[in-house]
Design a protein with these regions (language model features):
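Donor/substrate-binding cores of folate-linked one-carbon enzymes
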Residues: 1-87, 94-97
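An anion-binding loop in the catalytic cleft
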Residues: 99-161
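A generic structural signal for short, solvent-exposed coil/turn residues
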Residues: 20, 32-34, 90, 116-117, ...
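Short low-complexity stretches enriched in small and charged residues
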Residues: 88-92, 103-105
Length: 161
């Protein structure tokens, strides 16, 4: 889900959004012993704008199917990756804590939506002994609106892991 060699590694969607990217490339590449380092068969544009991570993954899945058809029909020759390699590290559940200091509303919105998919620890903020988990965010009329699930801090930490 990155324009390799930029973005090799883990949590590509989250690492792209947290760095301010608004679009990326879906890349079909040959598997090698080194992660995401193989030659590239094709790349296709994928918007990261709006919507939750889940919605972006659905769009990426549909685009992947189109790419598979093209790979089978066109049999492109793979091309060696060129350019500076940038590695992404898989995000940890602790990195899902919303760092609200010095964040714009758009950054808060992006942070919540980039984690809003099954299997990902939701964006959260701990206040006192309460853990607030955010999902289904929207940026409207100068504010971020989101669903919030409130639990006692530490009681449901493995719910989305």
């Amino acid at each position: 889900m990155t324009d390799v060699p930029y973005g090799r590694g883990g949590s590509p969607l989250q690492n792209l959004i947290v760095r301010g990217h608004r679009d990326t490339m879906m890349t079909a590449l040959r598997m090698t012993n080194e992660l995401d380092a193989g030659p590239v068969y094709m790349k296709r544009h994928l918007s990261l704008e709006g919507g939750s991570a889940e919605e972006i993954y659905i769009r990426a899945g549909m685009l992947s199917m189109e790419m598979v058809v093209s790979l089978v029909n066109d049999e492109p020759d793979p091309v060696v990756q060129e350019g500076e390699v940038t590695h992404f590290v898989r995000r940890t559940p602790q990195q899902s804590e919303l760092p609200v200091e010095d964040m714009s509303l758009e950054s808060v919105f992006d942070f919540i939506r980039m984690l809003d998919a099954d299997g990902y620890p939701r964006a959260f903020k701990t206040i006192g002994g309460l853990k607030l988990e955010f999902s289904r965010s929207a940026l409207r009329e100068g504010k971020v609106e989101a669903s919030v699930a409130i639990s006692i801090d530490g009681e449901n930490d493995n719910a989305n892991d």
